[in-house]
Amino acid sequence: MLDSFNREINYLRISVTDKCNLNCFYCKPGNFQEFSPGDILTFEEILEVVRAFLPLGLKKVRITGGEPLVRKNLLYLIENIAALPGIDDLALTTNGILFPRYARDLKSAGLSRVNFSLDSLNPDKFRSITGGGELKNVLEAINLALELDLTPVKINTVLLRGINLDEIDAFVDFIFRYPVHWRFIELMPLNDREKWQRQFVSVKEIVEIISAKYKLIPGKTVGGAGPARYYEVPEALGTIGVISPLSNHFCEYCNRLRLTSTGKLRLCLAKNQEVDIKSLLRSGISQEELTGVLREAILRKPRAHEFGDKDFLGTMANIGG
């Protein structure tokens, strides 16, 4: 379905939990409060939303969190979404820690591909950033995803000045050894703006740093039709991608809505404009009526984000990564 600005909205990102087995500081601020179980949508409620979205042209679904693999019985949700007519891309974003335990079952259930969040290739720094995670588990997960052909495999890294910007050569070197797509993402000002100003690294600076050592050739979009701009590097097995939500936003081409774990339909990541889907579901709304609500929401999707608004507050764990 087209929104009011002629963008085709065919992609739903579904957060199934705000909980995570890691504690990355930019995702969860110190005062982060987890939701209680009753606040979270059940899998049947999530499936109701997906089914109601299908008549509007839904084609792509991504399961996120928190860390989605900490949600019990996630395979049930994956299997049921994969079985729906019209869904041609079902993806998962994970930190990779639990992925080896579930990878083969996820593949069998119908998962198309997987993205990994990884902000350091230094084991000690990885533990520091994540609050105790083990890098070797994530590297095992990446290898397993490639082995199972859950491709294209994408790795998402938030580059942070003073934290991991000095590892950029190591990240680029990785694509010479593995056929993965390593994407660098600008830090978004979701909670602590003062810290954000100190740590923010623009995509322009990232490209300048990499191109000083490597030849970057603008490449084609890699499966998923997301906002990344990709570059090929001669002799590399993979590619480099950059995502610039702030310095060069991609709102003109935005094709997605977000369903939070608590049942709020978020029309834009950076706006507090939401539709309380959970209350509608629990009041007995019919699927046809819910489709109508989704249609109206799509038509209210804003033209562009407002990361500069001083009243914007949020955390990625609550909103959904």
From Swiss-Prot:
S-adenosyl-L-methionine binds at residues 26, 66, 117, 188. It comes from the Bacteria. Keywords: 4Fe-4S, GTP-binding, Iron, Iron-sulfur, Lyase, Metal-binding, Molybdenum cofactor biosynthesis, Nucleotide-binding, S-adenosyl-L-methionine. CDD domains: Radical_SAM, Twitch_MoaA. Binds 2 [4Fe-4S] clusters. Binds 1 [4Fe-4S] cluster coordinated with 3 cysteines and an exchangeable S-adenosyl-L-methionine and 1 [4Fe-4S] cluster coordinated with 3 cysteines and the GTP-derived substrate. GO terms for biological process: Mo-molybdopterin cofactor biosynthetic process. It catalyses: GTP + AH2 + S-adenosyl-L-methionine = (8S)-3',8-cyclo-7,8-dihydroguanosine 5'-triphosphate + 5'-deoxyadenosine + L-methionine + A + H(+). Its EC number is 4.1.99.22. It is an enzyme of class 4 (lyase). GTP binds at residues 13, 62, 93, 154, 256-258. Its cofactor is [4Fe-4S] cluster. Pfam families: Fer4_12, Mob_synth_C, Radical_SAM. [4Fe-4S] cluster 2 binds at residues 251, 254, 268. The keyword S-adenosyl-L-methionine applies. Monomer and homodimer. Belongs to the radical SAM superfamily. MoaA family. Catalyzes the cyclization of GTP to (8S)-3',8-cyclo-7,8-dihydroguanosine 5'-triphosphate. PANTHER family: MOLYBDENUM COFACTOR BIOSYNTHESIS PROTEIN 1, MOLYBDOPTERIN COFACTOR SYNTHESIS PROTEIN A. This is GTP 3',8-cyclase. The gene is moaA.
